[in-house]
Amino acid sequence: MTNDKIRNFAIIAHIDHGKSTLADRILEFTSTVSARESKAQILDSMELEQERGITIKLNAVQIKYKDYIFHLIDTPGHVDFTYEVSRSLAACEGALLLVDATQGIQAQTLANVYLAMEHDLEIIPIINKIDLPSADPERVKAEIENIIGIDASNAILISAKTGANIDKVIEAIIEKVPCPKEADSTKPLEALIFDSYFDNYRGVVILTRIFNGEVKVGDEIYFMQTKKSYFVTELGVKNPNEVKKDKLSAGEVGWISASIRDVKDVSVGDTLTLANNKLTTPLPGYKKLKPVVYTGFYPVDTRDYNDLKDALEKISLSDSSIVWEPETSKALGFGFRIGFLGLLHMDVLQERLEREFNLDIIATAPSVEFVVTLTNGDVQYITNPSLFPDRSTIKSIEEPFIKASIFLSDEYLGAIMELCQQKRGKYIDIEYIDDHRRKLIYELPLNEIIFDFFDLMKSYSKGYASFEYDFIGLRESDLVKVDILLNGEKIDALAMIVHRDFAYNKSRDLTEKLKEVIPRQNFEIPVQAAIGAKIIARETIKSYRKDVTAKLYGGDVTRRQKLLKKQKLGKKRMKSIGTVEVPQEAFLAILKTDTSKKRE
């Protein structure tokens, strides 16, 4: 197979614009998948992806069409999984830009297009869902030209659902996507690891793009970053199931198994070469993203701690963006503090741990990384609110800020601007895309975004607004630590860092929520929120009352008083030794506290 017959491309789009459906149609049109094997979301192999209707993991598949070989790398569309997209694009020469004919350009479309431009990819604009009555392809073409700045006059109009014009997409891939540059099978092996996963029988399986050279079964491969070497036991391509081959050559995308048992030996973004003919300089990898949200994961059964550690190591293989370290909590025991790229990322990882590894997890409320400068000049990076230093020792607190670009219709402008103001946002600019659509730019503290901003934005705009963001650095803020006390004892896992102006409202909301979700006991439980020694909110969980006087009838009143006094003493003793069981809902309650509500 000569290089001029190979095409490597990805599909980029905003979530729900029909990316996985288009991938399905391409696989069917090229007979890679027969009609009998076909199903919705063929490349979304994870059960979670099928259920939620989203792509979480990238996937690489080889397609044979006439005398050409295509390598389609499917990418996620949600803002949390941008790192998956950047990995996919590093292995491609072209990208199909898919835009919904009814919704037009959305925030994540733009973010992914800019990533593709950074990688100098050939971009082919495709307008999907033209079969819908509300489709407006001409408006979308104008948007692509005005916002992105690429010629959309020849944009391909398709319906991935019905399969209309899929043949034109295939022809455009052949004509417009460049063949792999300077791929030479005679040079030393030069391959980029863009993904990996763990197989219980074979160990670590690597997904790789071969830029130069070739690799065969039995070759000794060398990882340039981890400096480890292994012998290849199996290799091949996906179409979309694994197909074994004898070798992978320059320009190809495939998988390699080398009986690697230690997950730390493989690093996504590393360069693969041969042990007996090494490269001197590694390939430029993609940029490693810094976690945005930090949360504590604790096993419900403390005996599962080592199982949770093993599960995190295996998931880290294919999800190189998560960072984690052990931590302990008085309330929850031993667990891990984990860094994620966003709340959906956190939600998906928790669900994967519970499904794939049969673990029961308690997740604490998410937090961002605060930079605290102490009066003695020391600087601390705090991701766990319970470790916040004493206020008297703090000179200044800085929190991360973002620049948010929100795409929305005119009718929702007022509501979304009000939401941004409530979240301590600073208005920067508004851009007019066309007669009805606007791009709103705000600077916002990340700590306000990670809780409920996305849900509220969708709610206020009936699902039509979308946003993406970039970090703009740290800024000093007047932040305080709010401790939650149950029965007079601090629950470290419920502590939160909030702006002083919102501390009272958030504390009132949280104590009310905790009162609802914590089960009643045989004694009264005060639920308090405190800043330092000052209590700023309180609710009381009423006790169960056993009617100890029910057996009395008539007789002396002192008998009744004696029984009630005895009950009171029993409850007092129980209160002093009783521990309050805190359910998972209590930790989720922090996510649901809504400072956008107006309090009278």
From Swiss-Prot:
Q: What is its EC number?
A: 3.6.5.n1
From the Swiss-Prot or TrEMBL record, what is one GO molecular function term? translation elongation factor activity
Ranges where the tr-type G domain occurs: 4-181
Location in the cell reads: Cell membrane
Q: Quick one: which residues bind GTP? A: 16-21, 128-131
* Known catalytic reactions: GTP + H2O = GDP + phosphate + H(+)
Work out whether the entry's keyword set contains Transmembrane helix: no
Kindly report the protein's main subcellular placement as a broad class.
membrane
Question: Per the record, a Pfam family?
Answer: GTP_EFTU
Q: Which GO terms describe its cellular component?
A: plasma membrane
GO BP, one annotated term: positive regulation of translation
Annotated function: Required for accurate and efficient protein synthesis under certain stress conditions. May act as a fidelity factor of the translation reaction, by catalyzing a one-codon backward translocation of tRNAs on improperly translocated ribosomes. Back-translocation proceeds from a post-translocation (POST) complex to a pre-translocation (PRE) complex, thus giving elongation factor G a second chance to translocate the tRNAs correctly. Binds to ribosomes in a GTP-dependent manner.
Entry protein name: Elongation factor 4
In which organism is this protein found? Metamycoplasma arthritidis (strain 158L3-1)
